[in-house]
Amino acid sequence: MTKKEMRIISRLPPEQLQLWFKARFNIAPTQEVPAVVLEAGELRQRDFQWGLRPVWSKYPIINAQAESLLQKPTFRAPFQQRRCLVPADGFYEWRKPDKTPFRFTTPDNEPFCFAGIWDAPPSPEAKPLFVIITTAASPAVKPVHTRMPFILAPAQYDDWLTDPAIAAQIIAVASQVELRSYAVTPHVNRFANDDPRCLEPAG
């Protein structure tokens, strides 16, 4: 994602955005991910590790279902106090049973933000942790997967960061962002591959 694209999702000057974000092509759970938070009334970038680690879970939790997160203690406090914007310009889902990877973008390839929540780091030297909120698949995603990341409309960004009551109303309605998709090559299946080849259409 370029600094010009990032200006769409924030009020920060381009010089600051260039320092914050670099292009990524294949981000996987447990990796470090930049996100935007609101601190003291200012938008700030923070680096997070993807996946909450509650004491009762052997493995990190990488997403939270919009339909039930307010009923789950693991997510309740982060949702009320620590919401974030996770910038992206696309995401991947894998179609079963052949596990064909598909990339989803907006029709005009504009960047967008996933709805995220975060929690404190497990130790002073660690990064804070976050999860992406998911929702039922839109018509464009449904042929590939039953779920998808919750994509916020640009008009919802400020409310998502500032008001937990309105944020709850936002995720109570399925994401309305229009998407398109195309199959990509198995190159994206390997987490270590984080390069432009991940975006190339299959065939």
Task: Name every feature range the model reports, one short phrase each.
Residues 1-203:
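Short linear sequence motif anchored by a di-proline
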